Swiss-Prot record:
Stated family: Belongs to the universal ribosomal protein uL11 family.
Keywords: Methylation, Ribonucleoprotein, Ribosomal protein, RNA-binding, rRNA-binding
Organism: Nostoc sp. (strain PCC 7120 / SAG 25.82 / UTEX 2576)
GO cellular component: cytosolic large ribosomal subunit
Described function: Forms part of the ribosomal stalk which helps the ribosome interact with GTP-bound translation factors.
A biological process term (GO) from this entry: translation
Family annotation (Pfam families): Ribosomal_L11, Ribosomal_L11_N
Protein name: Large ribosomal subunit protein uL11
Complex formation: Part of the ribosomal stalk of the 50S ribosomal subunit. Interacts with L10 and the large rRNA to form the base of the stalk. L10 forms an elongated spine to which L12 dimers bind in a sequential fashion forming a multimeric L10(L12)X complex.
Amino acid sequence: MAKKVVAVIKLALNAGKANPAPPVGPALGQHGVNIMMFCKEYNAKTADQAGMVIPVEISVYEDRSFTFVLKTPPASVLIRKAAKIERGSNEPNKKKVGTITTAQLREIAQTKLPDLNANDIDAAMKIVAGTARNMGVTVTD
């Protein structure tokens, strides 16, 4: 018989840098999960993506065991990296802070495709372009 899921925890953590300090410790501790075991497994799986924020969805079972699924990095993080900017604009419709090419946009959309609610690459590109627009980043050919 399958184990019963008692909680699903969603966290966005730096790749390879999960530690028992907040936010990881309190989120997992209240469900009785072995925090160090999670940190070691997460860091091992994300070691090759250092410097990125990797969201994770942790399923906690009634016997206090857990499984986790890694998601793709947020579009905003990928856009900031491609445009080489620290943060998005605080007035995106007035002040533009960077530009990305259509090729970079396609690459980001390709990366995000499994987690987006889109069936093809063009729909994914529109979603990512909207995120870029809201950050004050323009898309050029």
